[in-house]
Amino acid sequence: MKTLLLTLVVLTIACLDLGYTKTCFNDDLTNPKTTELCRHSVYFCFKNSRIAGGVERMQRGCSLTCPDIKYNGKYIYCCTRDNCNA
């Protein structure tokens, strides 16, 4: 009986994947690609690029929501896989 209970607990933890956290790139164009572990409730990686004075500026990181804003030369890309915001 104890073996069955232990098996059920292990299967429950494996199915819920309690320890999973998303990783996203968090650099800009001037730094080498580095990653960050996102908070538990974060579902999106983002890449935000804009052109200012003829120079492309870019930011990457984790985001709770996925804003779909495209204005003033600004572009935001969101994705849900690990390190998908390269």
Curated annotation (Swiss-Prot):
Keyword Metal-binding in record: no
Signal peptide interval: 1-21
Protein name: Cardiotoxin homolog TA-ctx-like
A single GO molecular function term of this UniProt record: toxin activity
PROSITE patterns: SNAKE_TOXIN
Tissue/organ expression: Expressed by the venom gland.
Gene3D superfamilies: CD59
Transmembrane segments annotated in the record for this chain: none
One GO CC term on file: extracellular region
